[in-house]
Swiss-Prot record:
Example GO biological process: DNA replication, removal of RNA primer
Recorded family membership: Belongs to the XPG/RAD2 endonuclease family. FEN1 subfamily.
One Pfam family from the record: XPG_I
Region listing for I-domain, in residue ranges: 116-258
UniProt-recorded name of the protein: Flap endonuclease 1
Keywords: DNA damage, DNA repair, DNA replication, Endonuclease, Exonuclease, Hydrolase, Magnesium, Metal-binding, Nuclease
Chain residue ranges for the region called N-domain: 1-98
Molecular function via GO: 5'-3' exonuclease activity; 5'-flap endonuclease activity; DNA binding; magnesium ion binding
Highest taxon listed in the record's lineage: Archaea
Quaternary structure, from the entry: Interacts with PCNA. PCNA stimulates the nuclease activity without altering cleavage specificity.
Binding site for Mg(2+) 1: D27, D80, E152, E154
NCBIfam families (alphabetical): fen_arch
Length: 340
């Protein structure tokens, strides 16, 4: 879900090519969820192989990653670990929402209402361990590094960006800024023409760059105050925030209150100060290596085509594109591709 503070934040529109030569840590769960939600058949059914195993995430990961690399981007994917205890309520709520959407999807299918069915099917998307392991395996075969976060993937990606190991972190959620990423790229894995939900209208989605320094300067806040603002309007750890407080009103409160959380802690079901501390000092790890390698073409064909029934012609075309990028790069050589 993330934090609903987007309307307050200064953003810069980018072209993918503006990120040429940049290393970017991508929130893997965020990207995979997008692939599961958008890469579906007309009735909302996800792509599946002959054994009924979902493959939408593999299709998205394979072809979208190649697109990023053709633009000169060096992607690394960061996977979630164990969520904090106070995220339990939000995860339970999401599970309920998925179950409700699944029921509505089945009803819409029975009625032959394909547009409605697809809408509910997207909301029913769910990530499980099998999908995660498949995604990691594909990335390894493609020569793309992935990192296992001890807790939140966004926090780990932000840590990597703050260390300078990557140029930016990428996610749809603004939480990355709360975790301290100096640069956040949004829309990285959904760039292109996208259909608006429930409408026969398409829009052009472009990447956005948000700089933490610009955000703090624009809002006249410290990062600590930005976190307090987010808690007041609601985060994944206290969904909905404080009743009656929107972003603009919450901004005024945090600006002029030394301890804005104290007033609301008394009636909160969760420890607001624990949430603040988690954003300031989340669990992270240095146990990772960002090494980009040549793809294992034979194993990719075996994994995608033999095991999961992908079109061999399409996969081979993708591999040709991938091979071309890793051999010549876009405006950089093989030496700079492998350079950390």
């Amino acid at each position: 879900m993330g934090v609903p503070i987007g309307e307050l934040l200064p953003k810069k529109e980018l072209e993918l090519e503006n990120l040429n030569g940049r290393k970017v840590a991508i929130d893997a769960f965020n990207a995979i969820y997008q692939f599961l939600s958008t890469i579906r058949q007309k009735d909302g059914t996800p792509l599946m192989d002959s054994k009924g195993r979902i493959t939408s995430h593999l299709s998205g990961l394979f072809y979208r990653t190649i697109n990023l690399m053709e633009a000169g981007i060096k992607p690394a994917y960061v996977f979630d670990g164990k969520p904090p205890e106070f995220k339990k309520k939000e995860l339970e709520k999401r599970a309920e929402t998925r179950e409700e959407a699944l029921e509505k999807w089945e009803i819409a299918l029975a009625r032959g209402e394909l547009e409605e069915a697809k809408k509910y099917a997207q909301r029913a998307s769910k990530i499980n361990e099998i999908l995660i392991e498949d995604a990691k395996k594909l990335l390894e075969l493609m020569g793309i590094p992935w990192v296992q976060a001890p807790s939140e993937g966004e926090a780990q990606a932000a840590y990597m960006a703050s260390k300078g190991d990557v140029w930016a972190s990428a996610s749809q959620d603004y939480d990355s800024l709360l975790f301290g990423t100096p640069k956040l790229v949004r829309n990285l894995t959904i760039t292109g023409k996208r259909k608006l939900p429930g409408k026969d209208v398409y829009i052009e989605v472009k990447p956005e760059l948000i700089l933490l320094e610009d955000v703090l300067k624009e809002l006249k806040l410290t990062r600590e105050k930005l976190i307090e603002l987010a808690i007041l309007v609601g985060t994944d750890y206290n969904p909905g925030g404080i009743k009656g407080l929107g972003p603009k009103k919450a901004l005024e409160i945090v600006k002029y209150s030394k301890d804005p959380l104290s007033k609301y802690q008394k009636t909160s079901e969760v420890d607001l100060y624990a949430i603040k501390e988690f954003f300031l000092n989340p669990p992270t790890t240095n146990d990772y290596k960002l090494e980009w390698k040549l793809p294992d073409e034979e194993s990719i064909i075996k994994f995608l085509c033999d095991e999961h029934d992908f079109s061999e012609e399409r996969v081979k075309n993708g591999l040709e594109r991938l091979k071309k990028v890793t051999k010549t790069g876009k405006q950089f050589t093989l030496d700079t591709w492998f350079k950390k």
